[in-house]
Each structure stands twice: as structure tokens, then as C-alpha cells.
């Protein structure tokens, strides 16, 4: 017999969502990983871009929602939700649904005689009938080739920093036009750094949150899903992953891009006053220069700075997960680094599932956000528990999550 029916690799929002739904269905589960580890490394002072409802883990209603956290703890959470509060909330969820989480990292995942074998730090071996990979995006920072030759003291990714105040008094060139780059520039300015933003596009996209939804009043739910991904109308479409995965790529790819194109929350605008933003420029080279860095743009213009901060996002490539054994990786059908997934988010290796951003190619852009865990947890549980697949269902419709020890 295996040691467990399901081993979940990762204890962030997706791993916790999977555990909540699986345990609610009576499935034997072991959760492996440091709870909310990636979120704990994000920049101090960061605010979440997602709205209140879409920030809930596992479900936007029920015993582990953000509303339930506030009611149970008496904690008042500001809007936008501060990173520190979200980590506190995620830890509360973990304590309720996975108090037995095993914090040792998984060093190797391979096929085993009873399904899969996981080697944990310290040498322990764990056999599982099924494995759910919910390991997040920490392994996938997108670092442009022009920065390859620069030392870490000259060029880093936004994901490398927990506290941007280390750049106080420095000149920092921030690359990118999305939330990560723009919020980093705001935090740098507020920390006493001299920041400039360089954007390849000729304009910035801004997300106005609930502004348009409030104007629509009762019509809002018809055009905006609680998942909070995508613009008006399209939000409802991408909130149905079972529908999205049936689209031909010629339709799916443009829909996905339109839903998650680089954009910043509108509330960042006032915080960027005084920060130069250079539009329609692409960096073609970056070289070390006298303790700093010099970048050259496509039109020949140049900038010098003390540091180059890459707000260039993440590019999924599951081959970069350090724990995946090459023999297992070779059996996985992949497209551009993404695993090709079927019903229940199952990969081409039976019994191996991928949740979160790696599922975005097959199930759409909401898999890149916390709210995607609502669908992922339910779909995974239906597959694992052997329940019949229901008809297409809105990803925002809640499922009942029964937690045995909710005290």
C-alpha cells in the first residue's frame, strides 16, 4: 500500500485549495511544503491587485473564505488587501485545513512501484498513489537575455526582493509595464530611491477595479465574474475553464492575452507621480559600467543606473521545477513549457496533476490567480474521488467544502 492516496507538493493558495476540497471529500492527503512560502518573500508594502472576493483561497464563500477569516479573527483587512494580511490569512487557512503540513521540501519526484515516489529533505521516502504539483511560479522568473552577463549586484528580478528599501539613495531602472514593475517603482520611490520605468509598449494599461462594476449595479454579475480576471464580458468567459479548454488555440491564445495583458492597478497612479516612465523603448544590451549598469535602447539612446530591476514577469517551464525527475519529465506532454492537461487537471502521466500557472495553457488565465483555485480544487476532487464530471459550470459557483476540524 502507498503511504498516502494523494501527495500535494506545495502549501500556497493552490496547494491549500486542493487540500480543502480533497479532504472535504474524505480523500487521504499529505501536504508537503512551507505554507505561503513564495508570498512571504514578496516585497514589504505590497498590495494585492485582485479584488476582495477574488482574494479568497479555495472558495469565495464558506469556512475558509476571506470573509470567514475576518469574522473568526476580528481582523480588519484594508482594501486593497495588504500582502502581510494575505499571508496571515493564508496561514489561518493552512491551520484549519492542513495543520499537519510537512514543511520539508520535496527534493525529487519520480515514478514509483505504487504510483509515485517522493524523496524529502532529510532522506525520507514517501509513496503516493497520486501527486498534485502546486509548486507555484518561484522557479520561473523571466530574465531577458540582455541581463545574462550582469552580476546580481547590478541586475535582479523583482521576485528576488523582499525589501526594496535596500535601494534607498540608488538610481534604479525598472523594466516592465505590469503590476510587478509599476508597484516596485512606487515602492522604490517611497523608500528613497531614484526610479525610472522603461516600458516596451507605447502606453500603460490600468485596471480600475470595481469602478465599472459599481456603475453597472445589478447588471455587474452578468458581465463580471467573481474570479476578477479579464475585462467586462470576457471575465465571464474565462471564468469557465472547462469551456476555455475546448477552444482552438487560435481563439484561446488571444483570449488569454487580452485577459492578462500587462497592466497596473489604477490606485498606483498617484504613487508614481514624479517617477519618469519611458515608453516604446526596448533594451537591446546592458553592460557593467563603473559600479553601475548602462543600458542601450533600440534607437541607440542610453541610460545609466546603479541597478537594473527586471519586472518582466514569469515564464512557465515545468522543466525548471528542480524536483521533477528527468525520467518523469520525459513522459510529460508539454507545449512551450506547459504541461498539456485533461479532465481534472491531469497530465499525460496518469495520476500526476498540475495546478496554478502551469495549468493556464490548458484551462485559461484564471489559473494564474488565487481565484483559479476555486475551480482547480473542485475539478481535481471530482477526478480523484471518481465523481462524474458535471456539465460546464461557472468557476465562480461555490462548492461545499466540509472541514472536519474547523474549530
What label would you give each PLM region?
Residues 1-36, 79-179, 183-407:
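Flavin (primarily FAD) cofactor-binding/catalytic cores of flavoenzymes
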Residues 40-73, 225-245:
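Flavin (FAD/FMN) cofactor-binding and adjacent substrate-gating region
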